């Protein structure tokens, strides 16, 4: 039996949170800092020394020896440089532990050593990290010691954003301002601030670490590049919500405890659809905290797995033939007075503010579907989206029967008179309670689904930061809110104007609503008839960043400059090309050094067996050995030819000038060549004696953990 955990006692114990600040900061300093955190007012630099001292004292008391400016560069993972608290020794050789206000507020790093898309040249190395006081500092405790992590933004010497956090904070300010205007239009003048709230559901795989270390593809790329399906996959539907095995449960227990100590509100855990696949979901938080905490979740998942002899796979498609992993981004808008803008109430047809918000979101998603699709573009997601396991690459909105009925009433007659209800769930069993059903069902095939009081963006990849998706969501909805507020604030008759605006937006953007099965070919054809984009792969989605539409959208709200968008497009092309090249080279390495030599050894055994049987008994039937030897040899020849083709494709693609051209060449030429190499290898795995196969099979990986 494991020891009981007092969650309330340990929650946030490693976080410099509001409780700690209130205890340790002078009252006037605390009030000024709290004002900045809660209301978004400008940070007063004069309080930095007092905050730094209190933060250092708390950290040292908890065993910390170092601090770091913890930031999120455009690599998609976090970065940190550790400095000790030690100051210069005095004449007696003793040292004092220091953290100055300047060291808290500003750090410096090499801006050219991170992806910058040309914003930083090698000789222009200076980059700055700036303290984000809206996200609490925390202690990272592991085998390396205890480190005070100070969340920061990361920018170039000229102020260009080189990270994920800065644009997110900009977008939050943008939607805050415009959403407050919407509230005020409806007389809710007490609202002073609106914050996007996010709850990212994190899917992941766990495999045995010893087996993981035997596969170069998992080590180098995070996914398997070869592998035949075992006799059983996920077809029995017995893993989803199944009993959590003890080894996995012990991992989840330790993971939860680590996260709770770091103030991450880990809430739900369960087995997912694929064997060895699981999910962790947190409680909703402010968007910037949710983004930071999701990075902490992914890092902690890997650390805890390693300690327990496991490996955590966050790749979108670690195993071909079973479901991949995503990260559902649940998004809503909450006022400082406790109102959720996406709550339709019991009678949505009478909730005019909600209908306006809904119409604006429909407009935003329809007009900027390309940007929303691009925000979920990472190389691994190409293998997941539209594969009967995840939403299609076509952006559409699911609103459910109740809301769709209200929309239909407004579009057809100009007014809505009623809202459908869910009714009672009647089980027919006396001892089971009857209860009210939700007003609508769920649709797991939709990329952007309304689920009662929030929207769930389901396209985000499991390894990806949720920052970019929320940057796009916040900004495109801010634009729609602004245009609506501009029109309504100038109206002579508000009631008539808002009614006409809602109807107009619903009619103009009705095409984005789809409540059907997004997995079918019929939807692909229907979407084309509606004029909806189908950006099937990452490289096709990247150009959406550098359109005049995107420049104007992000520029108007100060979220990205034109230069920042162009840099991000270049970084995306480069990331895709590098990812594909690493995978291709890994396949070449595994095929040339492991699979082909193993198959040759096996064919020698077959040939020797054939010769021995013929010599011992000439009349014996050796057709099985002969057929197996011929089939194995033919596949070996096919594999060697495919290997040579892949090697040649890598060379020709590397010669392409420009990252855009190189990325497209990788998708058009290298990816198909990789598939051509994998096909004979996977067939050989089904023929070759397991004792000769050079690495663990799918069955070994996903069923033996």
Where are these regions (language model features)?
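Active-site proximal loops enriched in glycine and acidic residues that flank catalytic Cys/His/Asp
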Residues: 47, 71, 100, 282, ...
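Glycine-rich, acidic/polar active-site loops that bind/position phosphate-bearing ligands
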Residues: 125-314, 323-326, 333-570
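Basic/polar N-terminal segments that are highly enriched at the extreme N-terminus
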Residues: 1-9, 704-705
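Short, intrinsically disordered, low-complexity segments enriched in Ser/Thr and Pro
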Residues: 88-122, 237, 360-362, 484-493, ...
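C-terminal amphipathic alpha-helical interaction region
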Residues: 502, 507-705
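Conserved active-site and cofactor/substrate-binding residues in soluble primary-metabolism enzymes
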Residues: 20, 24-31, 50-54, 62, ...
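Active-site core of metal-dependent hydrolases
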Residues: 10-124
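Hydrophobic/aromatic-rich, well-ordered segments within soluble, folded domains that form packed cores
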Residues: 64, 68-72, 291-307, 333, ...
């Amino acid at each position: 039996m494991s020891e009981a955990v007092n969650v309330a006692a340990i929650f946030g114990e490693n976080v410099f949170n509001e409780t700690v600040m209130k205890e340790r900061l002078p009252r006037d300093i605390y009030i000024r800092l709290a004002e900045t955190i809660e209301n978004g007012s400008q940070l007063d630099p004069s309080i930095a020394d007092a905050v730094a001292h209190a933060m250092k004292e708390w950290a040292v008391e908890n065993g910390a020896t170092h601090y770091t400016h913890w930031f999120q560069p455009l690599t998609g993972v976090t970065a940190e440089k550790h400095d000790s608290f030690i100051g210069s020794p005095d004449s007696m050789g003793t040292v004092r532990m220091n953290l100055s206000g300047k060291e808290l507020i500003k750090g410096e790093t090499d801006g050219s050593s991170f992806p910058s898309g040309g914003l930083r040249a090698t000789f222009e190395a200076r980059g700055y990290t700036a303290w984000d006081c809206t996200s609490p500092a925390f202690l990272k405790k592991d085998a390396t010691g205890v480190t005070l992590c100070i969340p920061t933004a990361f920018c170039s010497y000229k102020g260009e954003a080189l990270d994920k956090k800065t644009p997110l904070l900009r977008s939050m300010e943008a939607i805050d301002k415009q959403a407050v205007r919407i509230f005020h239009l409806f007389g809710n003048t007490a609202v002073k601030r609106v914050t996007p709230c996010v709850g990212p559901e994190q899917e992941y795989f766990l495999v045995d670490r010893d087996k993981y270390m035997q596969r170069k593809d998992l080590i180098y790329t995070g996914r398997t590049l070869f592998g035949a399906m075992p006799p059983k996959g996920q077809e029995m539907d017995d893993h989803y919500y199944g009993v959590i095995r003890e080894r996995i449960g012990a991992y989840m227990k330790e993971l939860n405890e680590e996260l709770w100590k770091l103030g991450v509100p880990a809430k739900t855990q369960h087995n997912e659809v694929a064997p060895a696949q699981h999910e962790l979901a947190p409680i909703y938080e402010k968007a910037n905290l949710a983004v930071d905490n999701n990075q902490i979740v992914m890092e902690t998942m890997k650390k805890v797995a390693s300690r327990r002899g496991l490996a955590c796979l966050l790749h979108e498609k670690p195993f071909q033939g079973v479901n991949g992993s995503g990260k559902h981004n649940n998004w809503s808008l909450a006022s400082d007075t406790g109102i959720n803008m996406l709550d339709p109430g019991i009678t949505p047809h009478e909730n005019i503010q909600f209908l306006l918000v809904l119409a604006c979101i429909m407009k935003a998603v329809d007009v900027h579907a390309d940007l929303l699709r691009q925000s979920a573009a990472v190389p691994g997601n190409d293998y997941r989206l539209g594969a009967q396991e995840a939403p299609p690459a076509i952006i559409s909105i699911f609103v459910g029967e109740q809301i769709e009925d209200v929309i239909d009433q407004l579009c057809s007659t100009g007014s809505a008179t009623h809202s459908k209800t869910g009714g009672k769930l009647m089980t027919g069993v006396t001892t089971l309670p009857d209860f009210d059903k939700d007003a609508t069902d769920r649709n797991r095939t939709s990329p952007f689904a309304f689920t009662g009081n929030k929207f769930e963006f389901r396209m985000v990849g499991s390894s990806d930061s949720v920052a970019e998706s929320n940057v796009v969501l916040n900004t495109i909805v801010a634009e729609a809110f602004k245009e609506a507020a501009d029109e309504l604030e100038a109206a002579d008759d508000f009631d008539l104007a808002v009614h006409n605006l809602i109807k107009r937006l619903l009619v103009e953007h009705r095409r984005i609503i789809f409540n059907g099965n997004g997995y079918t070919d019929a939807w692909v054809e229907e979407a084309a008839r509606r004029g909806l984009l189908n950006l099937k792969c990452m490289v096709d989605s990247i150009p959406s960043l550098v359109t005049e539409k995107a420049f104007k959208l992000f520029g108007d709200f100060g979220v990205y400059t034109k230069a920042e968008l162009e840099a991000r497009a270049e970084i995306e092309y480069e990331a895709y090309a590098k990812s594909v090249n690493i995978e291709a080279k890994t396949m070449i390495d595994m095929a040339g050094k492991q699979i082909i030599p193993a198959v040759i050894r096996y064919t020698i055994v077959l040939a020797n067996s054939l010769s021995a049987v013929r010599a011992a008994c000439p009349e014996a039937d050796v057709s099985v050995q002969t057929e197996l030897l011929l089939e194995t040899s033919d596949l070996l020849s096919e594999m060697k030819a495919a290997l040579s083709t892949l090697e040649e494709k890598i060379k020709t693609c590397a010669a392409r000038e420009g990252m855009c051209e190189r990325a497209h060449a990788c998708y058009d030429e290298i990816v198909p060549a990789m598939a051509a190499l994998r096909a004979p290898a996977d067939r050989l795995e089904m023929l070759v004696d397991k004792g000769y196969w050079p690495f663990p099979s799918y069955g070994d990986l996903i069923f033996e953990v």
